[in-house]
Amino acid sequence: MLLLPIGLFGCGAKKKYAAADVSVISFSCSSMSYTDSYVYSLKKENEEWLFDADYSYDYENPRVEFENKKVSAQDAAAILDVVKEQGLILQAQKYKSPRIKAFVLDGGGYFLYFKMNDGTEINAEIYNEDLVNELRTLAEKCRKS
């Protein structure tokens, strides 16, 4: 008798994903300051990794924007290693939006998004400095190439 109510209320675990299941990862920061806002996106298409970025690399130079830059499997693996080491997929799955949306005029808003190989989308308003640093490193590498 007790098994029936447990099953009805969804006590089943969420599907566990690994970094290898990621087909798209995107991280962005929105800010009142244009130079502090950025968007990075890494996606796998036809067994190739493509990288998009829109950011400022310093306060004196214009924005850098590029789309669909081919990056090596090693560069993609460095990003996915951070995802794995920091447990970012599980963090994003566990994320719950705040009930009260507080609005801070100059507060940065961070957004992490995953699309998995099976089409599942996972997103959360969380920040991870290691991920940002790795994405920024890849963006700079692409900018200079």
Regions found by a protein language model. Give the residues of each.
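Phosphate-binding glycine-rich loops and adjacent basic patches that engage nucleotide phosphates
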Residues: Y34-E45, S72-D75, K94-V104
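Short, well-ordered, aromatic-rich surface patches in folded extracellular/luminal domains
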Residues: C11-M32, Q93-S145
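Short amphipathic beta-strand/extended segments with alternating polar/hydrophobic composition
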Residues: V39-K43, E65-A73, G119-D130
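A short-motif feature that recognizes glycine-rich, charge-decorated loops
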Residues: D54-Q91
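N-terminal export/targeting and maturation segments
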Residues: C11-P62, F66
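Short, surface-exposed linear segments at secondary-structure transitions and domain or protein termini
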Residues: E47-L50, Q74-L80, E129-C142
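Sec-dependent bacterial lipoprotein signal peptides
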Residues: M1-F9
